[in-house]
Amino acid sequence: MKTDIEIAQSIELKPIVDVVEKLGISYDDLELYGKYKAKLSFDKIRAVESNPVGKLILVTAINPTPAGEGKSTLTIGLADALNKIGKKTMIAIREPSLGPVMGIKGGAAGGGYAQVLPMEDINLHFTGDMHAITTANNALSALIDNHLHQGNELEIDQRRILWKRVVDLNDRALRHVTVGLGGPLNGIPREDGFDITVASEIMAILCLATDIEDLKRRLANIVIGYRYDRTPVSVGDLQVEGALALILKDAIKPNLVQTIYGTPAFVHGGPFANIAHGCNSVLATTTALHLADYTVTEAGFGADLGAEKFLDIKTPNLPTSPDAVVIVATLRALKMNGGVAKDALTEENVEAVRAGFANLKRHVENIRKFGIPAVVAINEFVSDTEAEIAVLKELCASIDVPVELASVWADGAEGGVALAETVVKTIAENPANYKRLYDNDLSVQEKIEKIVNEIYRGSKVNFEKKSQTQIAQIVQNGWDKLPICMAKTQYSFSDNPNALGAPENFEITIRELVPKLGAGFIVALTGDVMTMPGLPKRPAALNMDVESDGTVLGLF
């Protein structure tokens, strides 16, 4: 079998102008980045707003192994399969962060014969969105430090600045730094740090903004820190939202590419789901819904993180809610959740599949709490056995959830036809009745407890002293009606990454609450979740190279 990069390089791409023609998009509607990538103009986005709204399919997963369970691959393959059975379909997914690409994941544009192309460009610099977000974020940092240096008219307390610099890399050495050293000419010394770009509030804002004016409004609302009198300081107070929006004026426009089978795809925005809301841009998803009969999108990590945030944070900003949720399961992840060691996941173990099914069952139950029908997709691997697949299908039948085997990695669109047909049938026969998990009018504590009790199945939430102080500050400032964005390990329902399967009656500790007023939510930090990842002992970068003719090697 060829590698992902070898498959991608063997495909003859169509000009993006030809790919999107069937959607009613013309050459004049595009801002081209070469022959195969483009941004969609705001004029076209506004022109299609009066079109009917299509069906929305959300792809999520069970709690994953470190390698991931193939959500992006299944999302792409399902869309290709829907087109194959005659459904006018688009994809709306996130763009990869270079940090994980160079770190543990390698490429992140699907895999096998279910990829978005050109995958090398998408995984590297693409259309420059990550660069623009990084630049806007760091421009704000520079403007804050300049304000301190030039007399600090706003009386910002340099000990209470929340805003950090960012870089689109995994670099643990930058988590804590000191800036402003070198004497009076070089600024005011203070502690600072770097997050990864996709953890920046500006990334979340870009993915939730509906137009330039909304972008500016959200940027102005960012709280960068506090004054000496403990009152908040915003970007609006600094009067620099216009400059930041200027840097982002092109990045806010959705990017158009294609799959191996020519399915048009929006690849736009990429916040992490363990430290942010984990969904692609509202603008891309909404536009796809107006252009196609079916839109397939995904949310990061397991359904306890990405899907919950999609349904509680993103969906209220969309013209419709999901008509179906596809939960991706792999036998290796089920076995891991059933207690099998990572080095034994390729060995047949039917009993471990039975034990690990508790994890999948809980995710199905949780999706149903939102009033949306679920479909299970078994992402097929060569190590899967007939006995394991049979047991999983039997277990799914026992909870009355449709299940299909999908081999889109190996077989492309054809490998997803059965899944596509089942999803279409499920949508037709089981209309969704979407409802949010909680009302925003609940207190901060009540909203967090609702997520912990209903989705994670924990029994108690412990608020550390720092978070209690922050809750009082949030209430005092009138921010307590915002939704909650949980920052939690992706490997477990709990805040302990080693508590696999379906733990119950555990306690979760909230160590910090960070208001993200521009994004419009409050981040609740649990466990040891890092906003700047580190590299593994053997990073994927060690396998990457480029030949003298520019051919890329090693992106999986």
UniProtKB/Swiss-Prot annotation:
Keywords: ATP-binding, Ligase, Nucleotide-binding, One-carbon metabolism. Its EC number is 6.3.4.3. ATP binds at residues 65-72. GO terms for molecular function: ATP binding; formate-tetrahydrofolate ligase activity. The keyword Glycoprotein does not apply. GO terms for biological process: tetrahydrofolate interconversion. InterPro entries: Formate_THF_ligase (IPR000559), Formate_THF_ligase_CS (IPR020628), P-loop_NTPase (IPR027417). It holds the Pfam family FTHFS. It is an enzyme of class 6 (ligase). Pathway: One-carbon metabolism; tetrahydrofolate interconversion. It catalyses: (6S)-5,6,7,8-tetrahydrofolate + formate + ATP = (6R)-10-formyltetrahydrofolate + ADP + phosphate. It comes from the Bacteria. Belongs to the formate--tetrahydrofolate ligase family. This is Formate--tetrahydrofolate ligase. It comes from Streptococcus pneumoniae (strain Hungary19A-6). The gene is fhs.
